[in-house]
A protein has these predicted regions:
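Transmembrane beta-barrel domains of Gram-negative outer membranes and organellar outer membranes
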Residues: 20-256
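Cleavable N-terminal export/targeting peptides
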Residues: 1-25, 254-256
Length: 256
């Protein structure tokens, strides 16, 4: 895991504000990733029947009644490193219609064989190029630490995320995710997930201005296909009131 520690140190020097904006990936990272030599495709789709009706910045996509998604292409490099590409990121909203919104590169470092361990840890880095209607800043990034416990049958996972628009450490935005899951079998699980955005480290937003969403999630996993569906409810005025998410994933080739 030494490479991940070096990466964290480098990122904290250059990373730095981000306004509330749309998100294409509603997922808590648990430290697992595809085997070395395997290509994987995860298709993310989200629909917001009742969302925030005002844009996060002038010209931004409006969340209310919008649909967005992205194919996530991943490749297992080693048993502790996975690389990925999100492309194309797309949205359909009531103002712009169908749009293309940018792309992301992802680098995930984790303890080897995380799915088989009781205590898991890792870190994920994302580097985004954004269209002008998707984010107020052209280039943004994410640092996502991963801390978790597989207690069989219960999983507890925490991602204390820091988002940045490269404008100073004090402007790093704290947006943690938490997942508590119960595994009925190796194939089926249910979970509660919380996605939050407290605001910049220099001074969190007031509670009513923070974003907090609570999701109920069902997961199915097999050798051929992984599937996740979730329903999210906003807990504050700044949150989308109702969001639906679907993720479908499968390996595209066999392990060498």
């Amino acid at each position: 895991m030494r490479p991940s520690l070096i990466a964290i140190a480098v990122a904290l020097v250059v990373v730095p504000e981000i306004a509330f904006a749309q998100t294409d990936e509603i997922q808590v990272y648990d430290g697992g990733h595809v085997d070395p030599g395997v290509f994987n495709l995860t298709w993310h789709n989200n629909f917001t029947p009742r969302g925030v009706k005002t844009p996060a910045f002038p010209g931004a996509i409006v969340a209310d009644k919008s649909w967005n998604g992205v194919p996530e292409w991943a490749y297992g490099v080693t048993d502790w490193f996975e690389t990925g590409l999100y492309l194309p990121l797309y949205t359909r909203d009531k103002n712009y219609g169908a749009t293309l919104d940018g792309f992301k590169l992802r680098e995930l470092f984790t303890v080897p064989h995380a799915d088989d361990r009781t205590f898991v840890y890792g870190v994920n880095f994302e580097f985004s190029w954004n269209s002008k209607h998707w984010d107020a800043t052209r280039f943004t990034s994410e640092i996502r630490p991963i801390i978790g416990w597989h207690l069989k049958p219960v999983d507890i996972i925490v991602n204390p995320i820091l988002d940045t628009a490269y404008d100073g450490v004090k402007n790093l935005d704290f947006a943690p995710n938490v997942r508590v899951a119960y595994n009925f079998s190796p194939m089926w699980a249910i979970a509660a997930e919380e996605y939050a955005d407290f605001g910049p480290l220099r001074g969190f937003y007031s509670v009513s201005d923070q974003s907090h969403q609570l999701y109920g999630v069902v997961d199915y996993s097999s050798k051929a296909l992984d599937f996740e569906v979730g329903v999210g409810f906003g807990l504050t005025d700044a949150s989308d009131k109702l969001t639906l998410k679907v993720m479908v994933a499968r390996d595209l080739n066999s392990k060498h």
